[in-house]
Amino acid sequence: MGVCVGGIHRRSLYEEHQLQSPQGVTYCEDFHLIVRLCYFARKVVNVHRPFYHYRQQEGSVMHNLNKKTERDEQWVYQDIIRFFKEQGVYKDYRKTMCWRMLKATQELVLDKSNWKAFQEMVPDKKHYIWDCPYINRKLKMNMWCLTHHLSWISLLMLNLRKFRHGRT
């Protein structure tokens, strides 16, 4: 599942399915909406010609990732998973959405106080840790240990990481 940066959509899609961007979400809100637009569209066309120039602003949310953008991304992916389950198509997107959740929750693994939250977010993501292209081997090992009740290994890895970086 790729990401559509821009597009032209029929107004009737928004009206017929009561689609709108989620309020209060400033990161991944376009992905939240485009998934639904593509799902409900009877036809999707890809035009290989630029119609506008995408400008990245230095002050944009893409350049200022923080705890709120992390939470937004996690919420968006959880809501898309819920949507796919409601539509009865989650099995078709399970692997891709689990990969996205692993990427979105990787920061949680680096702080012991967040381990429970990591484990609770989409429990079936543990089946896709090793083949997820978005995270490095050390994080994969840490995630695998956490999801398989081997948190003592994760704690050891976390302490070694802190020691290596001069933080105690």
Q: Model segments located where?
A:
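Conserved nucleotide-sugar donor-binding catalytic segment
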Residues: 1-67, 73
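Short, contiguous, well-ordered secondary-structure segments
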Residues: 7, 108-110
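Inter-helical turn/loop segments and adjacent helix faces that build the functional surface
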Residues: 23, 87-92
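Short, charge-rich amphipathic alpha-helical segments embedded
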Residues: 30, 105, 130-132
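Catalytic core of nucleotide-sugar-dependent glycosyltransferases
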Residues: 49-58, 63-89, 110-129
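Short acidic alpha-helical/loop segments enriched in Asp/Glu that coordinate divalent cations
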Residues: 56, 93-96
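Amphipathic alpha-helical repeat scaffolds of TPR domains
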Residues: 96-107
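Membrane-interface aromatic/basic loop that binds lipid-linked glycans or pyrophosphate carriers
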Residues: 111-168
